[in-house]
Every structure is written in structure tokens, then in C-alpha cells.
């Protein structure tokens, strides 16, 4: 399968105070989120001048992608400029025929995979006749470079705290019902599997997996335990130090720089615990090489590169033009 471009498809984020509320309204449209909740989340962005780190990180990643492979790279977002619909129209006008789509999510599941598939279908429909074929690359939670980057980040974080610090992996929580509809529990099982792979690569026999950044009505069950509750339990048990690895995030989203670096760190300090946060891949050259490797898997017909461990968890393969992924692991969520 030949390609003549790469599309980096991401979530998007505000780049100024005046963009924060419109961005959050885009993210939550149709979900019935009360205005006061939006006001609360807006304060997190305003703490950083109304600028999310994600777009700047993605632009730096694009430069790394251009260095890692020869195809032109385009950039589109779901929730903010540059919108993917606009980007695909530019690709059409530039004569792009088929592009590999690399998303800033390593996982299967609705918000992690299927929603990006829907973004692709919507963008192609908006572009109309002549829209390029868009091939979404597979989730990469078990790719050797994904495991290597996080294992190295844990080693760097471990140098900042005493030996014996507890290793805690975090990922974005989702409603339990949504997780059970796909796989079942495909997202949470993939995260747990990746955490096991990374912990083993980093030399840890034990680790914890917790969830963060839940939202929505309190009566709706989300994946647990929550990271704040878990940190409290560790402190009460006398754990002196913790390494927090946000394995669910490939870049420093606001959920990382606020929820972990600000709120969780303050909680750790008040409990007398030392905390070191492992870095995310962000715009590392290895992350760009990972994307280039996924492209070559399709272009050259190579067997997907995967780290294998006990009880491996399946993942989707490619999705073309907004069709369900192959195998259809995420189709249950897509069809309700």
C-alpha cells in the first residue's frame, strides 16, 4: 500500500484565553455538561495562560515526522484549529490521493480509536469528490518503541526519588459501561497490558494501575481506583515516594500538566510523600520513528512489531476512509 502523505490527527487545544471556552464547548457538545463544570475546567487552562501544550507539542512532532520519513505531513484536530475537515480539503486541493493517518492515541476503544475513525469519515464527507483515501494506522500500545520510551522515562524519574519508590501508572478514566461495550473492556485491558510490558522493561516486579481525570455525574460509574484516592491510600500505608507514569497519554495534555503536575503533586507534598512524574513521548524522535514504522508495516506488508508478554491483548488494525477497524474490536461501541 503506497502513501503520498501523512496526516497527524489529534485532539486539539486552545492557544489563548479567548479560545478556552469555545474549545471546551466543542469538546463537550451534546453531552449535557453543566456550564459550571466548563468554568471549572477552564481555570485549568487559564492557569497556563489559556494555552494547551498539545498543539505546540504536535507541531514539534511534525518536524520529527518530516525527519523520520520522506512524505509530506499535514496536521488536523478534532476540537480546534486546524480542524481536520479543513486540513483534508487542503490535502484534496494539493492532489493527495492516499494518506496514512497517525493519531495521538495508542489505544482501542471509542474515544481512543472509533471517534478518530468518525473524524476521518466526517472530514472526507466535508471534502467531497476528490477527497484523499485516509488510512488510520493501528493502535500502538504494544509497539517496542512505545514500551521503550515509557521504560526510559520511568528510569529518569526514578533517579529523582529514593530507591524503592512505588511505581504507579495512570490513564484517562472512562465510564465503566463504555469500556464494557468494547471488547469487552478492551481499553482498560490494553492499558493494563501495556503497563505490565513497560514495568517489566523498566525492571519493576510490582506496580499499580489507576485512573484519572474522570468527569460527568457522580452516579455514573467510571474506571477506578482514582489516582488521588490511591495516593491517599499509599500515604496512609507509609509509602515514602511514588513514581507516576501517565502511560495513557502520549503527550503532556492538560490532564498531565494540571491534574498530575499541579493537583496530585500538591496532594503528595501535603502527605509528606516525594513524587516524580515520568515524561510522556511528546515530540521525541523515537515517537516519530514509531509512526514511520507503522506506515512501513502497511507500505511494505511487514508483520506488525509488537512486544509480547503473558496474556496479550488484541488491538485493531487499519481503518480505511472511516470504515470500522480490522478486526472490528471497536465496532460494538460504534454501533451502540
From Swiss-Prot:
UniProt-listed HAMAP family: Ferrochelatase
Catalytic function, reaction form: Fe-coproporphyrin III + 2 H(+) = coproporphyrin III + Fe(2+)
UniProt organism field: Mycobacterium avium (strain 104)
One Pfam family this sequence matches: Ferrochelatase
Listed name of the protein: Coproporphyrin III ferrochelatase
Pathway in which the depicted protein is active: Porphyrin-containing compound metabolism; protoheme biosynthesis
Name of the gene encoding the protein in the UniProt record: cpfC
GO molecular function terms noted in the UniProt entry: ferrochelatase activity; metal ion binding
EC numbers: 4.99.1.9
Domain of life: Bacteria
Enzyme class per UniProt: lyase
Family: Belongs to the ferrochelatase family.
Record flagged with keyword Kinase: no
Keywords: Cytoplasm, Heme biosynthesis, Iron, Lyase, Metal-binding, Porphyrin biosynthesis
Amino acid at each position: 500500500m503506497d502513501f503520498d502523505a501523512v496526516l497527524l490527527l489529534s485532539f486539539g487545544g486552545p492557544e489563548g484565553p479567548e479560545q478556552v471556552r469555545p474549545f471546551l464547548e466543542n469538546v463537550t457538545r451534546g453531552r449535557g455538561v453543566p456550564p459550571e463544570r466548563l468554568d471549572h475546567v477552564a481555570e485549568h487552562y487559564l492557569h497556563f495562560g489559556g494555552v494547551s501544550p498539545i498543539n505546540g507539542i504536535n507541531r514539534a512532532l511534525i518536524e520529527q515526522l518530516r525527519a523520520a520519513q520522506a512524505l509530506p505531513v499535514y496536521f488536523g484536530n478534532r476540537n480546534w484549529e486546524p480542524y481536520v475537515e479543513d486540513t483534508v480539503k487542503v490535502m484534496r486541493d494539493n492532489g493527495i490521493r492516499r494518506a496514512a493517518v497517525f493519531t495521538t492515541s495508542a489505544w482501542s476503544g471509542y474515544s481512543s480509536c472509533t471517534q478518530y475513525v468518525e473524524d476521518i469519515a466526517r472530514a472526507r464527507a466535508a471534502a467531497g469528490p476528490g477527497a484523499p483515501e485516509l488510512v488510520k494506522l493501528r493502535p500502538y500500545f504494544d509497539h517496542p518503541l512505545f514500551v521503550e520510551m515509557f521504560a526510559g522515562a520511568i528510569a529518569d524519574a526514578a533517579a529523582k526519588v529514593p530507591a524503592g519508590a512505588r511505581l504507579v501508572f495512570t490513564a484517562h478514566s472512562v465510564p465503566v459501561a463504555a469500556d464494557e461495550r468494547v471488547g469487552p473492556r478492551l481499553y482498560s485491558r490494553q492499558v493494563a497490558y501495556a503497563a505490565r510490558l513497560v514495568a517489566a522493561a523498566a525492571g519493576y516486579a510490582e506496580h499499580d494501575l489507576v485512573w484519572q481525570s474522570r468527569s460527568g455525574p457522580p452516579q455514573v460509574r467510571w474506571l477506578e481506583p482514582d489516582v488521588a484516592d490511591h495516593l491517599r491510600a499509599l500515604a496512609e500505608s507509609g509509602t515514602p515516594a511514588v513514581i507516576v507514569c501517565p502511560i495513557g497519554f502520549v503527550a503532556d495534555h492538560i490532564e498531565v500538566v494540571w491534574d498530575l503536575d499541579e493537583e496530585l503533586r500538591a496532594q503528595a507534598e501535603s502527605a509528606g510523600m516525594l513524587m516524580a512524574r515520568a515524561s510522556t513521548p511528546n515530540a521525541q524522535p523515537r515517537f516519530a520513528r514509531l509512526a514511520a514504522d507503522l506506515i512501513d508495516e502497511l507500505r511494505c506488508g511487514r508483520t506488525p512489531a509488537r512486544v509480547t508478554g503473558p496474556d496479550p491483548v488484541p488491538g485493531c488494525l487499519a481503518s480505511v476512509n472511516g470504515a470500522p477497524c480490522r478486526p472490528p474490536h471497536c465496532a460494538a461501541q460504534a454501533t451502540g
